[in-house]
Amino acid sequence: MSKIIPVSNLLDFYKKGLFPMADNADSEIINLYQPKKRFIIPINNFHVPKKLFKLFKKNTFTFKINNNFESVISKCQLANRKDNGTWINSIILDSYLNLHYEKKAHSVECYDQNQLIGGLYGVHIGGCFFGESMFSELSNSSKFCLLYLVAILKKNSF
């Protein structure tokens, strides 16, 4: 059984601008990072390329929220990355599952005929949503999840 970062600690980290990462999937060490700059998506002025928007409007996928958080974070852990690495180890996975059970971590999922083909997850504190990771098994499916998420955040006045 892996160690788990308590939910209260994770929330405190985010409030202080820190986020936890492992060096790789097998690491037993969690490092805290505090970047000088964080990427912020301005949801009220969110630019969607025309080609992507047309594809999104034509898609026949189903989107769900928090339907299968564990599969999303697991698929994010296994996603092919350019550097062949992941920052999601068993400690991160189990800790974020607990955060999800406390309704502080959420997933957006893209399904094609009931098969999970893309998704993202992140942490919600107050009026902020911190996107953590995404995966795509079909071209653009994770981008579609981001578009869906932005629409939800706008609707809920983030």
Regions found by a protein language model. Give the residues of each.
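N-acyltransferase acceptor-side catalytic subdomain
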Residues: 1-158
